[in-house]
């Protein structure tokens, strides 16, 4: 919250913070090279790119059924709760579909911008149990829900291993995808099917340096590609 132009409302209500364990698929998306790019860009160019970020989240809210989102400057986090979709495989289905929609739409938009733009989104996806925090404090403006837990940290860290137009999936997500290939990886659709790729040693070495990343995710994460769109639109798969 930007406090300079906002007032906080004080009430006589007692503060209470409720927590509930929920299973989620979480997507972290971040524009690669944004910080360096912004050093030589005009404010209007920067705001145009940030507008693209906001537009993507608004679009995803309508068509990809996420439960929660939060803007993070030149990126954002999206969360699908299992209970909203029936199974974690279904939540992951929507998370992966949204990830590649983000890549596809940014590619089209970047091609049409009248100035050089950041390289593309890097995306990290993690699955598992988190705690949803629902605060009810005596300051209503602060009562926004939030999520905490290992999958949140894992997704944020794995996102750093994704290059432009790259998508990284944690070990739990990989296990879910391999057990539900038709739903998660869309294997029966030649155009929409996704593929998992094991990371090479350089990526594993980088993952090993991330504080708090569990061993299963250091060695068990995978890159996800959409072969049809990759071959049609861009020639990178995001692997570092």
Q: Where in this protein do the model-derived segments appear?
A:
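Beta-sheet entry/capping signal
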Residues: 24, 66-67, 122, 165-167
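Catalytic core of nucleotidyl cyclases, primarily class III adenylyl/guanylyl cyclases
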Residues: 64-91, 108-148
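Amphipathic alpha-helical transducer elements in NTP-driven molecular machines
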Residues: 96-99, 148-155
């Amino acid at each position: 919250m930007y406090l300079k132009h906002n007032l906080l409302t004080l009430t006589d209500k007692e503060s209470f913070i409720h927590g509930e364990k929920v299973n989620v698929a979480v997507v972290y998306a971040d524009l690669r090279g944004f910080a360096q790019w912004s050093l030589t860009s005009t404010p209007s160019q920067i705001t145009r790119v940030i507008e693209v970020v906001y537009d993507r989240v608004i679009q995803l809210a309508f068509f990809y059924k996420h439960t929660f989102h939060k803007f993070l400057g030149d990126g954002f986090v999206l969360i699908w709760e299992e209970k909203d979709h029936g199974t974690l495989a279904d939540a992951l289905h929507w998370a992966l579909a949204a990830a590649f929609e983000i890549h596809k739409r940014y590619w089209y938009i970047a091609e049409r911008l009248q100035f050089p733009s950041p390289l593309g989104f890097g995306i990290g996806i993690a699955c598992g149990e988190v705690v949803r925090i629902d605060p009810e404090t005596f300051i209503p403006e602060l009562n926004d829900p939030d999520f905490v837990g290992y999958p949140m940290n894992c997704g944020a860290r794995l996102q750093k291993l994704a290059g432009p137009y790259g998508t990284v999936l944690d070990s739990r997500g990989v296990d879910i995808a391999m057990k539900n290939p038709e739903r998660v990886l869309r294997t029966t659709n030649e155009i929409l099917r996704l593929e998992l790729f094991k990371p090479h040693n350089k990526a594993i070495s980088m993952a090993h340096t991330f504080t708090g990343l569990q061993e299963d995710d250091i060695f068990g994460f995978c890159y996800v590609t959409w072969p049809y769109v990759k071959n049609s639109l861009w020639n990178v798969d995001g692997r570092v």
